[in-house]
């Protein structure tokens, strides 16, 4: 999942409408935690922009509880709206033990029980260089996946441009992306690259397919 944009201002709506929309938006983390348990997921990948900007304490409390309730490893790659800078909740808050936040350049963690290596990176400003440039998965684990906030549609985008060639040459099994608010996917080489869109549109300009992806990795 990606692009929750919690605490969005919802400009253009009345005060009553904004209040209702914020309440509905805060239900997203809990709904995804419920889905995770119901589907018996092995891990959760969150590809950035979970916050629209500054996060309220109410939203932080809801998010922490939901992430803990997932009960499995949760790996987060902050994006251009919730980037890791001084004062960021990703750096300043304490997160549940099952949560790993990628706060800098491309790195990886191994989930031994799944024989899986997960690569990720976090934005440190609103702009980010091409994180997959020259990258190739090197781990010996059975599954090689990555979670990034990136733009697969514009090669010159400042929001971590991702090219088809970079996806192909990564030799990942799966690349989970955020940033694009309409769901999409493509295959390049052995790598499936997918972005689920935002789970809740914030205006009439955010229609179309969106939600979350349930992904099964097979040999």
Identify the residue ranges that each predicted region occupies.
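N-terminal active-site segment of His-dependent metallophosphoesterases
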Residues: 1-62, 140
């Amino acid at each position: 999942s990606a692009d929750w944009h919690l605490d969005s201002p919802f400009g253009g709506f009345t005060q009553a409408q904004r209040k209702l929309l914020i309440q509905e938006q805060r239900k997203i983390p809990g709904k995804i935690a419920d889905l995770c348990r119901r589907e018996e997921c092995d891990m959760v990948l969150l590809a950035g922009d979970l916050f629209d900007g500054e996060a309220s304490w109410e939203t932080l409390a809801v998010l922490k509880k939901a992430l803990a309730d997932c009960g499995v490893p949760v790996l987060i790659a902050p994006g251009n709206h919730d980037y890791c800078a001084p004062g960021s909740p990703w750096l300043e808050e304490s997160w549940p033990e099952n949560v790993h936040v990628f706060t800098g350049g491309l790195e990886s963690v191994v989930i031994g029980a799944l024989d899986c290596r997960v690569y990720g990176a976090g934005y440190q400003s609103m702009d980010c260089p091409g994180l997959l440039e020259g990258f190739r998965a090197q781990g010996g684990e059975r599954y090689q996946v990555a979670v990034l906030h990136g733009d697969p549609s514009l090669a010159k985008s400042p929001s971590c441009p991702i090219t088809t060639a970079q996806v192909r040459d990564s030799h990942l099994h799966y690349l989970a992306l955020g940033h694009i608010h309409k769901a999409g996917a493509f295959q390049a080489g052995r790598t499936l690259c997918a972005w689920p869109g935002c789970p809740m549109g914030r205006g009439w300009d955010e229609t179309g397919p969106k939600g979350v992806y349930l992904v099964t990795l097979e040999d």
